[in-house]
Amino acid sequence: MRDFQIRELSRIAELAQPSVTNHLNALLKENLIIKEKKGIYPTFRANREDEMFKFYKKMDTLLMLKQTGFLDYIYDSCMPDSIILFGSASKGEDIAESDIDIFVQSPDKKLSLEKYEKTLNRKITLLFEENFSRLSKELKNNLLNGIILRGYLKAF
């Protein structure tokens, strides 16, 4: 997890330092970031333990999957019974290096994901299985606790 100083955030966001300070104060008030004093200047980082932070992180992932056309591509290519986001991204606990785990309830199919991986700046891992009952108990549990992106899961 990376810490940022106000000057660095100002350069990245292309905003004046007073504006960045105002935004940081609003995020601090919502407990979405953590402020620490390291040396002369304070640093800021995401509060990855906060439930609202995790919620916003999940919503951002869902929005990106939809806006990139990824979900439509999977659906149109495979016609699955369900598409499920599972793993760390479904909990809002993923980091920049995490992959995006997607279950596709359909027969296995070779798909070109490079375009979407480049746009999302993340590796996408697809798991295909037509018959939910063939999956391990652990994987079933992960899927049942995931987020259904399209269709519905026939668990029993």
Question: Where in this protein do the model-derived segments appear?
Answer:
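Catalytic core of pol beta-like nucleotidyltransferases
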Residues: M1-D81, S90-E97, Q105-F156
